[in-house]
A protein has these predicted regions:
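Basic/polar, cationic surfaces and motifs that engage anionic cell-wall
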Residues: 74-79, 88-154
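N-terminal catalytic cores of peptidoglycan-degrading enzymes
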Residues: 1-74
Length: 154
């Protein structure tokens, strides 16, 4: 689980999709220029209104985790699915986003052997802070019907 908004704190625009499809208009906002060297992607993006956008097949690798480690294994992109939430670390996520996750995550769970769900903050704690304190892990687990053992300790 990650969060993203481009430019930071702005929602509903085309910029996240542009970043994940390498079509971002860097001239739109000066802040976006710093993203030019990045080549990133995610499997899924959940907008504030609950719309789910898929960028990469869940059967393929996406470039969402960066330098990361989980349970002693490096390169989390090689063995994980990336869900990006439109948001920030501190702005509460929307009811529509949790409802979307309640549809998406069980569908993924039924098809893939998911052993854990973690945030960027858990797999790259020195570099990343998302999805941040605004993400309600208990609520997420409840709406998705996930056993506590797959969630981070809260």
């Amino acid at each position: 689980m990650h969060n993203i908004s481009l430019p930071p704190g702005q929602f509903d625009g085309p910029h996240v999709a542009g970043l994940f499809t390498n079509t971002l208009d860097y001239s739109f906002h000066p802040w976006l220029e710093r993203l030019r060297p990045l080549r990133v992607s995610a499997h899924f993006f959940v907008r504030r209104d609950g719309q789910i956008v898929q960028f990469v097949s869940a059967d393929k690798r996406a470039w969402h985790a960066g330098i990361s480690t989980f349970r002693g294994r490096d390169k989390c992109n090689d063995f994980s699915l990336g869900i990006e939430m439109e948001g920030t670390d501190v702005l509460p996520y929307t009811d529509a986003q949790y409802a979307a996750l309640a549809q998406l995550v069980p569908a993924l769970w039924s098809r893939y052997p998911l052993s854990a769900v973690r945030g960027h903050e858990h797999i790259a704690p020195v570099r990343k802070t998302d999805p941040g304190p605004a993400f309600d892990w208990r609520r997420f687990g409840e709406v998705c019907g996930l056993p506590a053992r797959v969630l981070p300790r809260i």
